[in-house]
Amino acid sequence: MTDSQQSKPKHVMMMAAGTGGHVFPALAVAKQLQQQGCQVSWLATPIGMENRLLKDQNIPIYQIDIQGVRGNGVIRKLAAPFKILKATFSAMRYMKQLKVDAVAGFGGYVAGPGGLAARLLGIPVLIHEQNAVAGFTNAQLSRVAKVVCEAFPNTFPASEKVVTTGNPVRREITDILSPKWRYDEREQAGKPLNILIVGGSLGAKALNERLPPALKQLQVPLNIFHQCGQQQVEATQALYADAPANLTVQVLPFIEDMAKAYSEADLIICRAGALTVTEVATAGVAAVFVPLPIAVDDHQTANAKFLADVGAAKICQQSTMTPEVLNQLFTTLMNRQLLTEMAVKARQHAQPNATQHVVGLIQKM
């Protein structure tokens, strides 16, 4: 390496688009790269949520016009190669103009043309797959990437370039106190079990409709915090209207401080998106995962199995969420010692240093 190369800050182009599941881990890595003196730019789509999320992050955005090519429609399939080619050339133009040294792809439509562009220009590519089942774009890019990061073990075939890093998570989640201390403190104080239900920003109708009747059948004292989405507050509250005296219920449209919610929960009931599973493990909380049944390649079930297989969580498929099944499941779980053991196992399988790990791999390219 020449003196001029050593003095020039490394320029890393991030590629992540479409959903928070792709964008948030990439942003965590980008911010740490900036803290280490790297130049960071972002390859985005014109209409993706990444544009809004990056608005005040001091990261320049470069857009390429690309949409999903997976799906039906003859015209769409015929046009796809031309759209990919055009987007690839646009990405190449940006990379040459910016003198990009390394590219880090975190998924979304933008990563395909961006990864191909980097490969054609001889720029090293790192990809990061958040789910336990690789998405279409990352599965293709794994063949040409220099480094392949997986959040969950065995997502990709074993190889020298495959590294299990975990998913980058926010600092406030990694700073949560140990589950053993939290659960023991609540037990010694004689507090009721805290049940946290999280349906995501829009809420999960199946959770909102099926969980209240089942929870009302339980005989033990419970504090229930049910995040149901803005549009489903009244309907969810109505289902708890005749709750017995042993239940204290709060129905919330959204939760602003998830770190606090995790730290206070004895049991969380939620979907099994990659970042949710990662945060549950990092926080150290016993969980019941209800995988989204329409998730591509059923990847949420695969995500949930990461913790279920080590005794840190239970999986309840939405199709089996009958009152009888839920009652049996919850009756078993209303045991603080069991929940403590599950939470400790969850924390044992977390990778709280994922952000630093990925950043280190990028710096070495």
UniProtKB/Swiss-Prot annotation:
<comment type="function">
    <text>Cell wall formation. Catalyzes the transfer of a GlcNAc subunit on undecaprenyl-pyrophosphoryl-MurNAc-pentapeptide (lipid intermediate I) to form undecaprenyl-pyrophosphoryl-MurNAc-(pentapeptide)GlcNAc (lipid intermediate II).</text>
</comment>
<keyword id="KW-0328">Glycosyltransferase</keyword>
<protein>
    <recommendedName>
        <fullName>UDP-N-acetylglucosamine--N-acetylmuramyl-(pentapeptide) pyrophosphoryl-undecaprenol N-acetylglucosamine transferase</fullName>
        <ecNumber>2.4.1.227</ecNumber>
    </recommendedName>
</protein>
<feature type="binding site">
    <location>
        <begin position="19"/>
        <end position="21"/>
    </location>
    <ligand>
        <name>UDP-N-acetyl-alpha-D-glucosamine</name>
    </ligand>
</feature>
<dbReference type="GO" id="GO:0051991">
    <property type="term" value="F:UDP-N-acetyl-D-glucosamine:N-acetylmuramoyl-L-alanyl-D-glutamyl-meso-2,6-diaminopimelyl-D-alanyl-D-alanine-diphosphoundecaprenol 4-beta-N-acetylglucosaminlytransferase activity"/>
</dbReference>
<dbReference type="InterPro" id="IPR006009">
    <property type="entry name" value="GlcNAc_MurG"/>
</dbReference>
<comment type="pathway">
    <text>Cell wall biogenesis; peptidoglycan biosynthesis.</text>
</comment>
<dbReference type="GO" id="GO:0050511">
    <property type="term" value="F:undecaprenyldiphospho-muramoylpentapeptide beta-N-acetylglucosaminyltransferase activity"/>
</dbReference>
<dbReference type="Pfam" id="PF03033">
    <property type="entry name" value="Glyco_transf_28"/>
</dbReference>
<feature type="binding site">
    <location>
        <position position="201"/>
    </location>
    <ligand>
        <name>UDP-N-acetyl-alpha-D-glucosamine</name>
    </ligand>
</feature>
<keyword id="KW-0573">Peptidoglycan synthesis</keyword>
<feature type="binding site">
    <location>
        <position position="300"/>
    </location>
    <ligand>
        <name>UDP-N-acetyl-alpha-D-glucosamine</name>
    </ligand>
</feature>
<dbReference type="Pfam" id="PF04101">
    <property type="entry name" value="Glyco_tran_28_C"/>
</dbReference>
<dbReference type="InterPro" id="IPR004276">
    <property type="entry name" value="GlycoTrans_28_N"/>
</dbReference>
<feature type="binding site">
    <location>
        <position position="170"/>
    </location>
    <ligand>
        <name>UDP-N-acetyl-alpha-D-glucosamine</name>
    </ligand>
</feature>
<comment type="similarity">
    <text>Belongs to the glycosyltransferase 28 family. MurG subfamily.</text>
</comment>
<dbReference type="GO" id="GO:0051301">
    <property type="term" value="P:cell division"/>
</dbReference>
<keyword id="KW-0472">Membrane</keyword>
<dbReference type="InterPro" id="IPR007235">
    <property type="entry name" value="Glyco_trans_28_C"/>
</dbReference>
<feature type="binding site">
    <location>
        <begin position="274"/>
        <end position="279"/>
    </location>
    <ligand>
        <name>UDP-N-acetyl-alpha-D-glucosamine</name>
    </ligand>
</feature>
<keyword id="KW-0808">Transferase</keyword>
<dbReference type="GO" id="GO:0008360">
    <property type="term" value="P:regulation of cell shape"/>
</dbReference>
<keyword id="KW-0997">Cell inner membrane</keyword>
<keyword id="KW-0132">Cell division</keyword>
<dbReference type="GO" id="GO:0071555">
    <property type="term" value="P:cell wall organization"/>
</dbReference>
<feature type="binding site">
    <location>
        <position position="131"/>
    </location>
    <ligand>
        <name>UDP-N-acetyl-alpha-D-glucosamine</name>
    </ligand>
</feature>
<keyword id="KW-0131">Cell cycle</keyword>
<keyword id="KW-0133">Cell shape</keyword>
<keyword id="KW-0961">Cell wall biogenesis/degradation</keyword>
<feature type="binding site">
    <location>
        <position position="255"/>
    </location>
    <ligand>
        <name>UDP-N-acetyl-alpha-D-glucosamine</name>
    </ligand>
</feature>
<dbReference type="GO" id="GO:0005886">
    <property type="term" value="C:plasma membrane"/>
</dbReference>
<dbReference type="GO" id="GO:0009252">
    <property type="term" value="P:peptidoglycan biosynthetic process"/>
</dbReference>
<dbReference type="GO" id="GO:0005975">
    <property type="term" value="P:carbohydrate metabolic process"/>
</dbReference>
<dbReference type="GO" id="GO:0030259">
    <property type="term" value="P:lipid glycosylation"/>
</dbReference>
<keyword id="KW-1003">Cell membrane</keyword>
